[in-house]
Structures are given as C-alpha cells and as structure tokens.
Amino acid sequence: MAFLLYYTLFISFMLWLAALLIISFSVYGSPEKVKLIKKTSLFFSFFQFILIIFFWILSDNISVLAEFDIYNFQFYKQWLFLYNFHYVIGMDNISLLFLLLTFFLTPICILISWNSIKYRYNSFIICLIFITFILFNIFCVLDLVFFYIFFESILIPMFILIGVWGSRQRKIHAVYQLFFYTLLGSLLMLLGILVIYSHIQTTDIRVLYNTNFSFYRQLILWASFFFAFCVKVPLFPFHIWLPEAHVEAPTVGSVILAGVLLKLGTYGLLRFVIPIFCDATYFFLPLVYTLCLLGIIYTCCSTIRQVDLKKVIAYASVSHMSFVILGLFTSNIQGIGGSVFLMLSHGIVSSGLFFCIGCVYDRYKTRILRYYSGLVSTMPIFSLCLFILILSNISFPGTSSFIGEFLILLGLFENNHFAALIATFSIILTAVYSIWLYNRIIFNRLVVNYYLRFSDFSKKEFVVGFIFCFITILFGLKGSYIISLIEAPLYVYLSFK
C-alpha cells in the first residue's frame, strides 16, 4: 500500500518535471527546436498515461485501508497542513477513471496540435501540461478549499489557450464569457465553503460525509454548490458561454473543454452535493428534473437550427450533460452508474467529433454547414470515422453512449415515468439532427470542385481517428467491466441517502 502512495506522488512529480523541461526548452530553445519540443511533450504525456494504466492494474486487487473503508478510497496521503485545511489526495475507482480519461486525451491533444498550432508552440505545451496537472489535483484532492482552488485555477490556462490560439476575432469575447460566467458561478460555492467552515471548522471531505447539517442549512449549501457546478457543466439556462467558447477555441481547446472540463461540474455534483446534502437533494429534485428536461428539449431543437458545425456539437454536449445530471439525481445504482459511464463516453465521443470538425476546418477554412457536401467521395476514411462517432452520439446499440443512456433511462423510470418519457423522446431528436448533419456533409452531391484539392486523413489524423473509434466501440461491447469498477464506490454514495 505504501508503494501505491509513493507511486501517486511519482505521477505528480513527473507532471511537474515535464512542465519544467518544456519551460526550459521555451526559454533557451530556438524556433528550430519546436520538433524536439513536440516529441518530448508527446513522450512525457504518453509515459504518464502508461503510468496511470500501470497503477490501475496494480490497484485492482489491493484492499482498501481499513480506517478509510467506508468511503471506498483506495488510498490517501496528507501533504500540507494549514490551520484546518489539509492538502490531502485520495482516489477511488471513479477518480481513477476520470484520470485515465485526462491522461488519455493529453497525448491525443499533442498529436492533434502537431500541425494545427502554427505559432508559440512552446507556450501551448506549457499551457497543456498545467491543465493536466490541475485536472489531476481536481480528481484527487479531498479538501473542499483545495478543490475550489484547483477548480478555479483551470480557468487560467483555458483562458490563455482560447485567447491566444483561438480561430477568429471574437475569441477574446468568448474567453471573457467563459471566465466570468464560471467565475461568478463559483463564487457561490466559495460562500458555501465559508458557511461549512464556520459551522464545523474543517473542509475535509471525509468529515463532511459524516456531518449532519440542519435542513435549512442544507438548502442554502445545496443551492450554492449546485448552481456553481451547473454553470461549469453547463446546464440550461447557464449554457450561453459554451457554444461561443467552442466556436472560437482551437481544436485542442474544444477537445479539452468537451472531453474533461465539462465533467468537472457533474463530478462535483456526484462527489459533494448528492452525498453530503441528501435531504436538500430530495427537496430540490423537481427543480433539477425540470431544468434538465427543458435543457434537453431546448438544446435538441436549437441544434437543428445551427449552421456552424462546432455549435452543433456544442449544443449536443449540453443535451448529453443534462442527461448525465438526470441520471445522477435518480439516486439509484442504475442511474448514477449510467451517468458516470455516459460522462466517460461523452469525453471520448465529443472529443472525436470536435477532432473531425477540426480536420475539415484545417483543409477548407470554414465550419459553415452549407459549404459542405459529398465529402465521402474525397475523404472516405474521414467519413467512416465520423459515421462511427455519429452512431455513438445517437446512442446506437454497440456504441459507448448506448450503455450510459440506457442505464440512465432505466434508473429514471424507477423514479419518474413522465421525465423518463420526455428523456426518451429527446433521443429521437438527437438522431434527427445527427443523421441529417451526417447526410448533409457526407452524402449530398459534390457541387464544388474545390474539395477535390484536398486529401483524406493524414497518418497522424488516421491514428487519432482510429483510437477514438476503437475506444467508442470497445466501451460499447465491454462496458460491463467499467460498470463493475464503479459499482463499489456508488454503493457507498447511496449509503448516505
């Protein structure tokens, strides 16, 4: 067990070492050394991914610490002590899966940016490494104060990533929307943390799980945390910043934003709001269902009207994340397990869709839907990759999203038949805009010979596209293993009801 503790510290150390190496290249290197920086960053990111997989294999059969068994965390380590604030890291299988998603997307982002980031590549890699490090801490830290610090710190590198390497003139407007929407929302969580500290003199999550707050205090704390996390998800009607941020972000920024950052809000709901404020969760359940169902229907209808390819996927992401929140608040193992699975699936599928859109944008320099048609005749491999990802986006059986949405609907039917009926109807709307989008850009008659000037996937793009499609199908066929991993910690959360 001690080996696992030091192993985790080693992962954290490797992240910082990678960042320092990249910084040294940036300071002392010349523009001719950009290729060396690319190879070095790719090596470190891939090495970190191998490390976390190795840790996953090692920890699979290791028992939990006895004094920490009720939380089903596999380990914890206290580093810093400041008043009653502890920098404590810990991990259960849910944290581990989100870390796997983070470390999986990091080398993918470097491959995507290999030719698409044309300037200041050194600074871009520094930004990406620090995003990875902050995400590592968000998924592992066990103190609310430090969670809040890292939760807000992620805005800084994302602000730089979109503001510097964004694609159009409105990128500054987009990053200000991203920054201020999420910052103002998180101030509510800060107020909630202050209320908690004034009440029990600690913000340690392990203590909070055993603390019984009064009902009225729970209502206040639930509202402060819920709306802070819903802005980050984002849930309707707090979603205004997301389509603009996606449109202006580079492909890598969209992959990170859709793949991991949108999961921070739902992760916070699962880790803090639902198990700690149980009574308030039941009290506000009608409000949550109403917001989620309105968001699903509204975003599905809005998606059909969009003309920008990135906005289509952005609104689809809002719809899927509303589905996730529906599952989290079913308070049964099927719904919550389906939500966790759908979060992981959405991280893969939406990242793959934004990658495909980035590929055609790099060639044709436009994302307007009406300029695309008949791409199957010039980009057949791209068309096949997009087809697999579109199938997963509509939750086709055999793909990853099907398992998550099916479990969510199964759990929702146990609680509210009407909500489950509306959520099921939204799947039809998702299929409508997804299939129409694919048919419009892939199978329509080729009317512009300009498209014939460009080739299909390059070798690097083929590797990235193949990985996305392979993981999507693998999750769809072998999803039972992922479900078995998260069952134990989910039963622990349900025990707090």
From Swiss-Prot:
Keywords carried by this UniProt record: Electron transport, Membrane, Mitochondrion, NAD, Respiratory chain, Translocase, Transmembrane, Transmembrane helix, Transport, Ubiquinone
Ranges that cross the membrane: 3-23, 42-62, 94-114, 122-142, 144-164, 178-198, 220-240, 250-270, 276-296, 313-333, 340-360, 374-394, 418-438, 463-483
Q: What is its main location?
A: mitochondrion
What is the E.C. number? 7.1.1.2
- Bilayer topology: Multi-pass membrane protein
Which BP terms in the Gene Ontology apply to this protein?
Answer: ATP synthesis coupled electron transport; electron transport coupled proton transport
A GO MF annotation of the entry reads: ubiquinone binding
Where in the cell does this protein reside?
Mitochondrion membrane
Instruction: Specify the superkingdom.
Output: Eukaryota
The signal peptide annotation in the UniProt record is none
Task: From the UniProt record, list the reaction(s) this protein catalyses.
Answer: a ubiquinone + NADH + 5 H(+)(in) = a ubiquinol + NAD(+) + 4 H(+)(out)
Keyword Transferase recorded = no
State its role.
Core subunit of the mitochondrial membrane respiratory chain NADH dehydrogenase (Complex I) that is believed to belong to the minimal assembly required for catalysis. Complex I functions in the transfer of electrons from NADH to the respiratory chain. The immediate electron acceptor for the enzyme is believed to be ubiquinone.
Which family is this protein grouped under?
A: Belongs to the complex I subunit 4 family.
The protein's name: NADH-ubiquinone oxidoreductase chain 4
Organism, scientific name: Acanthamoeba castellanii (Amoeba)
- What gene is this protein a product of? ND4
